[in-house]
Regions:
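Transmembrane beta-barrel domains of bacterial outer-membrane proteins
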Residues: 22-147, 239-248, 281
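Transmembrane beta-barrel strands of outer-membrane/channel proteins
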Residues: 43-51, 86-92, 127-133, 165-169, ...
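Solvent-exposed loop/turn segments connecting transmembrane beta-strands
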Residues: 59-64, 103-105, 135-143, 168-177, ...
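Outer-membrane beta-barrel translocator/channel fold
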Residues: 61, 92-101, 198-271, 275-276, ...
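Outer-membrane beta-barrel architecture
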Residues: 71-73, 112-116, 149-153, 182, ...
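Residue-level signature of outer-membrane beta-barrel architecture
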Residues: 74-76, 117, 154-156, 169, ...
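Repeated loop/turn-to-beta-strand initiation elements of outer-membrane beta-barrel proteins
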Residues: 78-84, 121-127, 159-163, 190-193, ...
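Outer-membrane beta-barrel "beta-signal"
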Residues: 181-185, 190, 253-259, 286-300
């Protein structure tokens, strides 16, 4: 799922030198090479389960959902803090519950192609496209899409508040493009507000190993379906586009003491789930339900 992830800028320089004294002369030694502050290899796996709840239209019954996502990227240094990033991703939704004719799964396999400015492992500005196939079962030419996003970060108050602006879109997205962004407020050394949509968060880091946060998520992805023949008979479509969304609020904690891995666990409420067949003006909504999540990230 494509979203517009953005982070704050914190620039620093480091240098070291040493001098060895002789009887009458001093010889300067070359400064050691500073360690790489940005990871080159990025790995992420996530699974999120939303428990069963009813459709707004009772004839459709009930549904639960399981979301899985795997991605791997590698950064290639261009110059300074500018990188070219390339990678792959596979994501999949599986739906259980009533056999009502709606898709029982949706999936996507895509590439990542990006140019970004990276500071301390955080993307401060960049542009990315994710070309790939977004489909139900059949991989075909009309299942190809290329979601894109562009973003930039700027200081509003030195070392305290930053503004983020961004846009994103896709060929089969509705609307075809949408804004994102917000502000980052460094409240203290341990507390910050990342008011960045589509994934705002209030983050507390008591130390280098623990990360606690209250989060929100707006997740929207469009897929090419096969036959959609619902039991209520108002929705009978072939080869249609559906924009599926899951919007959540919750809390999560992460532990990064096992370098280079970060282990993440979270829970909350999926407040809205929806199958939006926008070209046919048909939406199928599902009531709120609790969710649980586990994830693992690695940067090296």
């Amino acid at each position: 799922m494509k979203n517009i992830p953005v982070f704050f800028i914190s620039l620093f320089l480091s240098a070291a030198s040493s001098v060895i004294a002789g009887t009458a002369t001093f010889e300067a030694q070359p400064a050691p090479t500073p360690p790489e502050e940005n990871s080159r290899d990025l790995f992420c796996y996530e699974t999120t389960y939303t428990f069963r709840s009813d459709f707004k239209e009772s004839k459709l019954g009930h549904s639960d959902s399981l979301y899985d996502d795997f991605s791997y990227d590698h950064r290639f240094l261009i110059t300074g803090k500018w990188y070219f990033r390339a990678g792959v991703e596979y994501e999949r939704y599986d739906f259980g519950g009533t056999d009502n004719g709606l898709p029982d799964h949706l999936q996507a396999a895509m590439a990542h192609v990006a140019v970004e400015y990276v500071v301390k492992d955080y993307g401060a500005a960049g542009i990315e496209i994710d070309p790939g196939f977004y489909f139900q079962d059949n991989v075909s030419g009309d299942a190809f899409d290329f979601p894109w996003k562009i973003f930039a970060t700027m200081p509003l108050k030195k070392d305290k508040i930053f503004g983020v602006i961004g846009f994103g879109g896709a060929l089969y997205q509705h609307p075809i493009a949408a804004p994102g962004g917000g502000i980052i407020w460094l409240i203290s050394d341990k507390l910050r507000l990342q008011g960045i949509f589509p994934r705002p968060a209030l983050v507390y880091q008591p130390n280098d190993d623990w990360d606690l946060r209250i989060t929100g998520e707006l997740n929207y992805t469009s897929f090419r379906t096969d036959d959609v023949l619902t039991t209520e008979r108002k929705l009978q479509l072939h080869n249609a586009i559906v924009q599926y969304s899951e919007n959540r609020v919750g809390a999560q904690m992460a532990y990064s003491g096992f370098k280079p891995f970060k282990i993440i666990a979270g829970a909350g409420v999926t407040i809205a789930r929806e199958f939006d067949f926008f070209r046919a003006s048909q939406k199928k909504k599902i009531d709120p339900a609790p969710y649980v999540r586990i994830a693992m990230e690695a940067k090296f």
